[in-house]
């Protein structure tokens, strides 16, 4: 449902904005908060575009859904790149777009989003700015450092597997309900035609 997706995106965008500015102005951690806020602003603009250009549609097409979920992955990856990469505890949220897709989109689109998410995880593992201070004073053990992306990959695969399983069952039930509704609709039409024919015969 488009409205549900829009609302979830607003929750994410507002959460990002509050977190970035709380870390910068309340905790006084040092990082590029201006660029981080611009990335959040980009996310807000994409959501406004979703509201404006798709206002007459209750459901997004497969293609449109993929583009917006790709934007979500890109936007969050950029934020994580600015704030520590996979060491950032919020990196777990990178899994959400793909999991959301597994419930609502077809297998091909979901696999493509899993690949994009995996590439994003790999990139921000090796290329990123330092985690906002004062945590920069702590030197991470290299085994701990690399265990985080490994855990993310494992979670990505298993969560998507379970989500795909439940999503498939949900789609099967939905198709069955739609077929039942079609049959009932046709029966109503036949009853209506039969009534009209009987009325015509008696007239």
Task: List the predicted regions and their residue ranges.
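Hydrophobic core segments of transmembrane alpha-helices in multi-pass, intramembrane catalytic enzymes
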Residues: 91-98, 155
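Conserved HAMP-HisKA connector
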Residues: 173-203
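Hydrophobic transmembrane alpha-helices and their membrane-interface boundaries in multi-pass
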Residues: 11-85, 94-97, 117-118
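Juxtamembrane or sensor-core-proximal signal-transducing alpha helices
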Residues: 49-54, 147-184
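Membrane-helix interface "capping/anchor" motifs
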Residues: 56-62, 102-114
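N-terminal membrane topogenic signal
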Residues: 1-11
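Alpha-helical transmembrane segments of polytopic membrane proteins
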Residues: 35-40, 141-152
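Hydrophobic transmembrane alpha-helices
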Residues: 15-20, 68-89, 107-143
């Amino acid at each position: 449902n488009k409205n549900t997706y829009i609302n979830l995106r607003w929750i994410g965008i507002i959460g990002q904005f509050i977190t970035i500015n709380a870390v910068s102005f309340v905790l006084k951690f040092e990082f590029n908060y201006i660029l981080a806020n611009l990335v959040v602003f980009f996310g807000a603009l994409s959501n406004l575009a979703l509201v404006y250009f798709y206002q007459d549609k209750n459901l997004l097409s497969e293609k449109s859904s993929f583009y917006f979920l790709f934007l979500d992955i890109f936007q969050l990856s950029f934020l994580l790149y600015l704030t520590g990469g996979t060491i950032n505890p919020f990196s777990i949220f990178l899994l959400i777009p793909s999991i959301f897709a597994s419930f609502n989109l077809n297998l091909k689109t979901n696999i493509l989003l899993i690949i994009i998410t995996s590439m994003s995880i790999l990139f921000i593992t090796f290329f990123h700015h330092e985690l906002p201070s004062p945590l920069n004073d702590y030197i991470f053990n290299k085994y701990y450092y690399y265990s985080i992306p490994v855990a993310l990959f494992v979670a990505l695969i298993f969560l998507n597997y379970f989500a795909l399983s439940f999503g498939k069952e949900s789609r099967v039930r939905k198709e069955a309900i739609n077929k039942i509704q079609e049959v009932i609709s046709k029966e109503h039409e036949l009853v209506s035609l039969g009534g009209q024919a009987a009325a015509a015969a008696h007239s």
